[in-house]
Amino acid sequence: MIKIGKDLSKFSVKSEKPSTKDELTSIIENRMRKYGNECDMNDIDISLITDMTHLFFGSEFNGNISKWDTSHVTDMSYMFAWSSFNRDISEWDVSNVNSMNCMFTHAEFNQPIGDWDVKNVRNMSWMFSESKFNQDISRWKTGRFANLVNMFFDCPIKEVYKMK
């Protein structure tokens, strides 16, 4: 069965390369209107984007962005807060991210991200607060000055999965 309007790989779509968060936001909104909340957006080249704050805040987007090149992103604060997003982003390069403040707060997200390199993240406060997250991140190593205030507030994560 073919899902028309969901998987963009079935269509000839010109890859887009936004240079600002506003351009990226516009592309995402247009794609969601045209193809729905579960559309594949892996063809969007986000390699110039450094700020992803509030990108999917309160959104019902739950499409594929697993192959995005996030290696230049420095801020992911509130990126998926209050959103329905719950897809694989385990391969993202987050090694240059400084802030993940409230990134998944109140979100549906519950996918493995235990292999992320978070050593440069300085702010993880409220990151998973009141979210569905319950995955193993015990191998994460943060800098000694990282803000972890209420990172797991009212989150169902098991103690053994938390950072050591």
What are these regions (language model features)?
Residues 1-164:
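Negatively charged
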